[in-house]
Each structure stands twice: as C-alpha cells, then as structure tokens.
Amino acid sequence: MVHHDGADAHAGHAAPAQPPMKSDTATPKLNSEVELGSLPSEAHNDIMQMARVGDITGMEKLFAAGEYDATYSDDEGITPLHWAAINNQYAMCKFLIDKGAEINKKGGESVATPLQWAAQRCHYYTVHLLLQHGADPLITDSQGYNTLHISTFNGNVLLIVLLLHQGIPVDVEDAYGHTALMWSAYKGFPACVDVFLRWGASVHAKDEQGFTALHWALVKGSPGCIQKLIEYGADRFAKTANGKTPAITAQELNTVAAWQKALDECGYDEHGNAIVPSWPGASYLLQDRRSFMTKFTFLWPFVMVWATMVVMAGMPVFVGIPLGVLAGYAVQWVAQQVIAYAPPDMRQLQKTPWMAGIFAGSLFLCIMNWLLHIFGSTMFGQDSAVIPNLLFAFFISMTIWFYIRCMVDDPGFVPKMGGVAEQKAVIDELISLWKFDESNFCVTCMIRTPLRSKHCRRCQRCVAKHDHHCPWVYNCIGVNNHRHFFFYLINLTLSVVTYDWLTYRYLSTLSETASDECNILAPSLCRIVNADTYSLLTAIWASLQLTWVSMLLFVQFVQVSSAMTTYENMHGIDNYSATSLNSSFTSTGAPLNPPSLPAPGPSPAAGGARHGGRHAHGHNHKQGFIKQWSRLLGVDAFIETAAGRGATTGKGSKRNKRGNPYSRGCVTNCKDFWCDPSPMFGKHENGAAVLGGVPVNYTDMYESPGVMTSGGGGRRRGGGYESVAGEEV
C-alpha cells in the first residue's frame, strides 16, 4: 500500500502509522522533474507546455489554428488547465476558463481536478479563481480525498481558511473516515488543528478503525496538537476498534513524553484523570480556574513584597537580607505550586498578572507607609512640608488612575467580524487586491489587519497601533491607552522623587533621637537606619523602580517624537511594495497585468507551525534569564535606542532606510500625541488618533498615509507601507 510518508498501516495493526489510502494508486506525478523537465515536441504536448509556462500568446495562436481548444485532454485526462493550475499560472488559468475549459475535469494517475492540483501546491490565489468559476471542492480523487483533505497535507493555514469559507463541511470524511482534523493532527500542524477546532470540528469523530484525532496526533507526537485537542474536550480514554486508548497508542509509538506533557499542561495526571489539589476549598475556588488564578496571582505578590520588607527591616543586615530574599522566594514558590493548576496559558508567572501584582503591592505599601508614618510627621511637625505632601498626594493619585486605566481599558482591539459571511467578504476583497497573505489577514481573529496593528498572543486579539504588551499592567499598550501609559510613567517618576524627599525629611527628624549603634556604617548613617528601617527600605525599593522607569521614559520620548511604536522601533517598518506584493505574487504566478507588478519569488512557507510573520503562533524558543528580564524591564529597547541601532535613531539601518511614513516632524509628531482631542478621563473612541493634524482611526486604516493624502484608492500598488511583522514584544 502506497502512503505519503512511505509507512504501512493495516487495519489490524497494533497502532496506526498513517491513515490508510483508498487504493494502491500512486499520487500524481507532480515533482519538479515532471513540471520543469523538457516535454516532447509533438503538437499535442505543445499545448501542455504552453499551459505550464503561461504562454498565453502561443496558446491563442494554437486555438486560432483550430486544431485544439481549451477542452483538450491527453490520454490520462489531463488538460491544459491542470498544468496551468499546478504551476500557478494564474493568468493562463483565467484565459483557459474564459475559453471554455472544463473546470472539474479529472485527470492524471490520481484522477484529480485542476482545483486539487493547485491545492496540492498551496496556490490559494489560483484555488480561489477556480472556485469562483464553479470548481467543486467536494469532488474526490482516486484515493478519496477532496480539496480540503489535500490542502491539509501541506498545512497551509491561509488555504484552509479560504476553503472553509466556501461552505465545505469541516468534518467531511475521506474514503476511510478520516477528517481534515485527523490529518492535521497526524501531520503535526498545531496551527491547522487550532483553525479546525475553532471552526467546530468534532474531536469525537472516529475513522473506520475507531481512531480519533487524538490517536492520530500521537503518531507524530506534536505536543501542541495533543494539548489543543485535550483543551477542546477530546476523550482521553477513547478506544479504537482494537481497544487501544490514547495512552496505549502513545506507548506503542514512543510518544509517551509528549502525551504526558500535554496532559500535565491541561491539568491531568499521567493516567488522564483530573488533578484536584488537596488544600481546603480547592474544589470551590477552582470552579473558574482562570478567574481565580488571575485574582490570586495579582494579590499574592502583595504578601511577597510585604514579607520581604518586614523580614529585612526587623533583623540585622547580615541576617535580614538573605532571610528577606528567602522569605520572598518562599512566597513565590507557593504561587508556583498554585499555578500548576492554572489553565495551560497561565502556567508561567510572566503570563499572569504577577508582575502587575508586584508593582501594585509595592505601590500599596509605600502609600500606607506614607499615610501611617511619614504624612503625620512631615505635615504637622515643627518643620512641616505641606506642599511636598500635597504634591505627592496628587502625583500618586494620578499614578493610580492612569495605572488602572492602562490595566482595564481596551488598548485598541480591532473589532472582529460579525459572522462567516463578513469574513468571506473580507477574504474575497483581499484576494481581489492581491493582499491575502499573513501580513494583511489574521487567521486567529479572522480579520483584515490594519496598518501598524499586531496580533498579541497574550491577549489573543489584534491591537491597533500596537506599542507593546506590558506585563507590569497586564495589558497591551495600543492606540487607546498609549497616552495613559505615558502619563502613568511620568506621574510614577514624580511620585518616587517626592516620596524619597519626604522620607528623607521624616528620617532626618526621627534620627536625632535614634541609636547610632550598627555593624558597618558610620554613626550618622546608623541613626538614619535605626530611626525607621522599614520606611528606609520602602524608599530604597521605590527608588530602584526609577531605573527601568527612566529607561522606558527615555525610549518613549524618542519614539513619540519620531512617531514610532516600540515594536516598530525594534523591528522596523516593512515597505509595502517590497513585502506585500512580493508575498501575494508568490501565490498567484503570472500576473493578470504583468507590467504593473513584481515577479514572483519563492513559494511561501506552509503554515503548520508558523503561518505568518506578524501573526506567528508557533512555540518560541526559551529565552535566557538575562534576556527575559531585559525585555520585561525594557532594557533591550533602551540599549537599541541609545546605541543608535533602533529604527528611530539608526541612520544606516536597513529597517529605517525607507523612512517613516507616519512621521511629520518632531513638533507635529509630539502635537499629534499630546494634543489628541480624545478625553483624558473619559471614554476613548476605539482606534481614534491624530496623524499630521488629521483625525484617523487605526482600527480600519489599511492604506499608508502617503496613499491617503494623495487620494489613492484601495488598489494602489507602489510606495506605501505595510503592517509591521515579527514576533511578540
């Protein structure tokens, strides 16, 4: 029996190696040697050669001679349309269809249609053309595969999304009962599995041997596929016709490690049973795990910061510092044990509100210390400091206000479509504009992505004018809350400065009667430390925050004056003509209007593990400790900007060589940002902003500023700028 991967699978075999085919018929001869090799020079082969290379002029002459027409087929039933489709000759396909080519004609050793030939090579522009002219995606070849099955073999997510929007049943089976979900799980394409599951594919469907998609995912052992299926409720104990459970299948195929890892990530033990913690009230608290974990990881850092401060303040320095660090680590260890029961996407502290909780806890302790100790001493004492106290009260109030706004407000999520019909209309429009690619369409949100937007994997939404995802506010910073974020940083800086000054005044007065005995410090410093160690530690801890806040403020000031976001500064702005058009024509072959468009490049990568530059959802490699904290604290952006390597300051950088289409000069850029008429304390209209003094909305801005100001329409090709692309900030 012939298989795609050369493996045998018999109905009675202990474990599957590959879904069985319908017959022993080989797949069509679609290798590069057949496509690109020299064809015989007989007249009946010349028509195929012309179709293969897209020679429309020659084809017209051949038809004019009257010997052949568009319905011609060879002895195997292969038509010119087959060869044009598989070689991505879009213009030739259009020409042949207009000349009456039989669009659903079967041919070749696999007895497949031109649509299936195009789908096998992931030529989704050609696929769309054929579908628009009546190609039937449900026709099967000699092995029982329809177009959706064939498209799944290569894992191209955009092609699968295109086909699903044509009304193809997502659970349609091949000759042996395999669904597209089973094939994508077997092939190890997590992105495809995710698309099918979100589209409603059944995780309980079984093939003729009784295998579910979960059984097939264990063949390749892709943890992402296995985990996603379990998350969507796949039966962990489903038995095949031979009584094989997924656990037995994993053992026979040596994929036990991937199986158990996926179970653990989803909250199950190695036997597939739900793990319930033994601590009191666990069953009640974990009824809504996500809600509980969000609240717990935000509030528990309050305890960690307080415990660390109290231990350090209450003991001698040589003992207090190590014990304080140990106390903080112990509290964090408890949190790590608790989040072991969190949803899969919250199993790491940096993916929870933990960092936001550390800041909020620190802020709370400083405010309480000011109210209980510093305020009374410095406000009503002999040498009162009324104005500094009032200033601190104002700055800290503004810090709290803008911090909450940054955390809870919509950062500028791009609205999703109302249904499948609207999504299909968007896809059809993008294809008509030659823009149906990873940079212009988000397969997770199923929307057209506006300029400067980016899909955030943490928020699972596309954010308009995305700046970065900030773990300290547990939210994205986008067009709606960017200015609030800036004011939060400014007021935080002023709050720390005034708090330090008030603490100094407070300790100076208190130290006059304090003991001057300590281990290593001078008597004058000993009196300050002994006066109120806890207040001194809170001031030191608050001052430490000025390091990352100062760097972040510097970077933000530079970027605002240059009309750039953090993401654009770190990754640059892609040029429209150099990226989008080249990407689109790698999928369309010969253009309908050759003089106006660039030549096609290499074929785009399949989307199994990664289906787009900006919208990549594959697994990232683990970063080192220093690099991870460098990103969390904004040190990497500061170094890039200060060293002149960022897009805002790098003069010779490739990322900056085409200039910034959003910049209108430093003064105008700052005016656009700071004088935005959107209310500071009221509700912000989603996506509203100002660009060059002109109101714009970044949730539906699809043309570059140059095109808009020149009055260009949606089909303008050259000189514009495309959406930014890359991985999460």
UniProtKB/Swiss-Prot annotation:
Gene: ptr-1
Family annotation (PANTHER family): ANK_REP_REGION DOMAIN-CONTAINING PROTEIN-RELATED, PALMITOYLTRANSFERASE HIP14
Region (Disordered), start-end ranges: 1-28, 587-620, 709-729
Gene3D superfamilies: Ankyrin repeat-containing domain
Keyword tags: Acyltransferase, ANK repeat, Endosome, Golgi apparatus, Lipoprotein, Membrane, Palmitate, Repeat, Transferase, Transmembrane, Transmembrane helix
Upper taxonomic lineage: Eukaryota, Fungi, Dikarya, Ascomycota, Pezizomycotina
Cytoplasmic topological domain residue ranges: 1-297, 340-354, 405-483, 556-729
Lumenal side: 376-383, 505-534
Domain notes: The DHHC domain is required for palmitoyltransferase activity.
Bias-annotated ranges (Basic and acidic residues): 1-11
Protein name, UniProt field: Palmitoyltransferase akr1
Residue spans crossing the bilayer: 298-318, 319-339, 355-375, 384-404, 484-504, 535-555
Annotated ranges, domain DHHC: 440-490
Bias (Pro residues) ranges: 592-603
Parts forming coiled coils: none
Localization, UniProt: Early endosome membrane; Golgi apparatus membrane
EC class name: transferase
InterPro entries recorded: Ankyrin_rpt, Ankyrin_rpt-contain_sf, Palmitoyltrfase_DHHC
Molecular function in Gene Ontology: protein-cysteine S-palmitoyltransferase activity
